[in-house]
């Protein structure tokens, strides 16, 4: 399944979500998150930007990104949602968060952006302002080796300046992809808390 809503659950504030995978591809951990969101009534799409390729090794994942190039990755992200309705929440893990950030900022109708271990500088994505109708939620491990406070702060300033809501949640762990059960950085407590906070954001 890639976008079904499971029967019997119909919350009044059900959202339609696009969940982008990380540099490691559409791993089981991403699909598990999608299923959990479906179980509480949301409709979730999980585009595969790698055409089936999945990685467990960091260097192999980095090589894949280098092979594609960031512009191509973002182009694939935009193409993946082109056939969908406009009123969507965009979410993603790591590189997938950057994809979610781009699409949420540039595709009219976005209802929110959930960036897990992810934000990029707005100027690097080619625009100066953030849409006033698109709230943002950012999640990071406190000791994530890829965390850049200046980038997070700059995004917060731009989003708040637009009038949109901005939430930042930090977690007492040191890994990057701490929500993927099959990755060395997995932290079950932090992953569950992040999921709970995402669910609350989707209610707003």
Give the residues covered by each predicted segment.
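Acidic catalytic loop of the alpha/beta-hydrolase fold
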Residues: 143-148
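A conserved short beta-strand
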Residues: 109-119
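Active-site signature of alpha/beta-hydrolase-fold catalytic machinery across serine-
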Residues: 32, 102-106
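Short beta-strand immediately N-terminal to the catalytic nucleophile in serine-hydrolase-like folds
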Residues: 90-92, 116
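C-terminal catalytic histidine-bearing segment of alpha/beta-hydrolase fold enzymes
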Residues: 165-204
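Gly/Ala-rich beta-loop-alpha elbow adjacent to hydrolase catalytic centers
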Residues: 92-96, 100
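Short beta-strand/loop motif that positions the catalytic acidic residue
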Residues: 132, 138-140
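Serine-hydrolase catalytic machinery in alpha/beta-hydrolase-like enzymes
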Residues: 1-85, 178-179
